[in-house]
């Protein structure tokens, strides 16, 4: 009498289920984005919703904060984007576009999720008001500070030497 254990189809089904069990975790892992990939997707969304003429591209990504392992939990992000030469209507990736000389720089902050299936982000960007010093300004200011400090040191030396000179009593 033949039992189900001896059935070749049961062995095949067991093998199929085993393989599915091994493949499914890999499929889930493949849906988790890296921190930078999630930020790049958020920038794509910013470009789609922007009313500006040109695309924006990642200029600087702040270090990744310590995060929990749940890809569905919103993760805090902060980064800087800069205007490119590519028009917003182009189908070109912003990463393939050069930065526009004197292009608008925006500071962006918010949250992203790393779960590719959810693909959610909440980002707001404002014009970056930080001044980027030109080398000429840097050297001029450094020279002024050094000059002031040098004058202060010379004055302190003069004051010290005046106190060393013996005073004559009249």
From Swiss-Prot:
Antimicrobial protein that is an integral component of the innate immune system. Binds to bacterial lipopolysaccharides (LPS). Acts via neutrophil N-formyl peptide receptors to enhance the release of CXCL2. Postsecretory processing generates multiple cathelicidin antimicrobial peptides with various lengths which act as a topical antimicrobial defense in sweat on skin. The unprocessed precursor form, cathelicidin antimicrobial peptide, inhibits the growth of Gram-negative E.coli and E.aerogenes with efficiencies comparable to that of the mature peptide LL-37 (in vitro). Keywords: Antibiotic, Antimicrobial, Cleavage on pair of basic residues, Disulfide bond, Immunity, Innate immunity, Secreted, Signal. GO terms for cellular component: extracellular space; vesicle. The keyword DNA-binding does not apply. Its main location: secreted. Disulfide bonds join 86-97, 108-125. It is found in: Secreted; Vesicle. InterPro entries: Cathelicidin-like (IPR001894), Cathelicidin_CS (IPR018216), Cathlecidin_C (IPR022746), Cystatin_sf (IPR046350). GO terms for biological process: antimicrobial humoral immune response mediated by antimicrobial peptide; defense response to Gram-negative bacterium; defense response to Gram-positive bacterium; innate immune response; neutrophil activation. It comes from Nomascus concolor (Black crested gibbon). Residues 1-30 form the signal peptide. SUPFAM superfamilies: Cystatin/monellin (SSF54403). The gene is CAMP. One of its GO terms (molecular function) is lipopolysaccharide binding. PANTHER family: CATHELICIDIN (PTHR10206), CATHELICIDIN ANTIMICROBIAL PEPTIDE (PTHR10206:SF2). Residues 150-162 are annotated as: Active core. This is Cathelicidin antimicrobial peptide. Proteolytically cleaved by proteinase PRTN3 into antibacterial peptide LL-37. Proteolytically cleaved by cathepsin CTSG and neutrophil elastase ELANE. After secretion onto the skin surface, the CAMP gene product is processed by a serine protease-dependent mechanism into multiple novel antimicrobial peptides distinct from and shorter than cathelicidin LL-37. These peptides show enhanced antimicrobial action, acquiring the ability to kill skin pathogens such as S.aureus, E.coli and C.albicans. These peptides have lost the ability to stimulate CXCL8/IL8 release from keratinocytes. The peptides act synergistically, killing bacteria at lower concentrations when present together, and maintain activity at increased salt condition. Belongs to the cathelicidin family. Residues 31-131 form a propeptide.
């Amino acid at each position: 009498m033949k039992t189900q254990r001896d059935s070749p189809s049961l062995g095949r089904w067991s093998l199929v289920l085993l393989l599915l069990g091994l493949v499914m975790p890999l499929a889930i892992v493949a849906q988790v984005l890296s921190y930078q990939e999630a930020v790049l997707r958020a920038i794509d969304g910013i470009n789609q919703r922007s009313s500006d003429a040109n695309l924006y591209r990642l200029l600087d990504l702040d270090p990744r904060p310590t995060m929990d392992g749940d890809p569905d939990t919103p993760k805090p992000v902060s980064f800087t984007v800069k205007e490119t030469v590519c028009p917003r209507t182009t189908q070109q990736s912003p990463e393939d576009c050069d930065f526009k000389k004197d292009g608008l720089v925006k500071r962006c902050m918010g949250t992203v999720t790393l779960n590719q299936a959810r693909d959610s982000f909440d980002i707001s960007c404002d014009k970056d008001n930080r001044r980027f010093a030109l080398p000429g300004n840097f050297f001029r200011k450094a020279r002024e500070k050094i000059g002031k400090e040098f004058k202060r040191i010379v004055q302190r030396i003069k004051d010290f030497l005046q106190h060393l000179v013996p005073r004559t009593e009249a």
